[in-house]
């Protein structure tokens, strides 16, 4: 079979790499891909970004199914486009993807269905938002409602920082439509973890747990990034925590979306804050939902997956995730991000990368933001 993966990052490289391991898979097209996917056996880059043109390609090239990596195509309705043409694709519809594309939608959904999350209010008026900040104090979290390329969340440790964030989004309109509405929520303390599952609309297949680390520098210092590394499994997700997440967050979310008439299919990623209450009992709250695999969490998770990933995706599309199991390498997988100088604020482009093999013993190199130069 031939498969299409949409995206260009390390996440998509890892997804395509794992799909290509299957003896059932002849070729995996990656649109648009990167230098790493261009250099990986059985993968082929596809220079198409228009969603309708991607559907044309899938229809005319006998693509068995399509997997969507990043959030932007999901928010633009790529799943709707493919399904309207009778093409198999794994991911949520534009409507269901609002769990990620609208923070206000997600918070209202969680409140309506009793899913644990931080207390919040939503604002479109800057003065009202400033008044709320003065009332609540700091630390406090300011979130743009829409997708903002990683710039939409400010963890304000002082009231001054919170007021600046409100003005940045609402008054100065620095994030455009994405920041025209903001969510202000209570600051949660504890340890974060990533909990990713596959959903077929009704059944759930959990992936291995993971934890990413966003600070740029060693010792958890420096600015936040898209992620400097991740590992799987996440020790903080004990068997007790695991069951709490499934019972209090994952199952209620899948049921709630169905009850609301917006059936969810695809990868569901719950960003968790794990802590303890006053009596010392563990608690779990939802920081956010994503409607796709995390990056860089995908890389260590895919490295541990022993099952045929293409079979799991097909089960997700066909509504039979209850008929399959995911088997994992019991060893820990660690992913470390190598970033260019100046990352994340002003990454230097054009530096030549050398001495990094695509694959060795127990080591795989996944690419993001790379391309070939004139010398290949």
Please state what every model-predicted region is.
Residues 1-95:
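ATP-binding N-terminal substructure of ATP-dependent carboxylate-amine bond-forming enzymes
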Residues 38-41, 98-104, 217-218:
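Short, charged, surface-exposed secondary-structure boundary motifs
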Residues 44-50, 121-125, 156:
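Short acidic-hydrophobic, aromatic-tinged amphipathic segments that line or gate anion-handling sites
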Residues 92-152:
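A conserved helix-loop-beta module that forms one wall/lid of the active-site cleft
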Residues 152, 156-302:
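Internal nucleotide-binding/catalytic subdomain
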Residues 245-268, 290-360, 368-374:
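Active-site "cap" helix and flanking loop/linker of ATP-utilizing ligase/carboxylase catalytic domains
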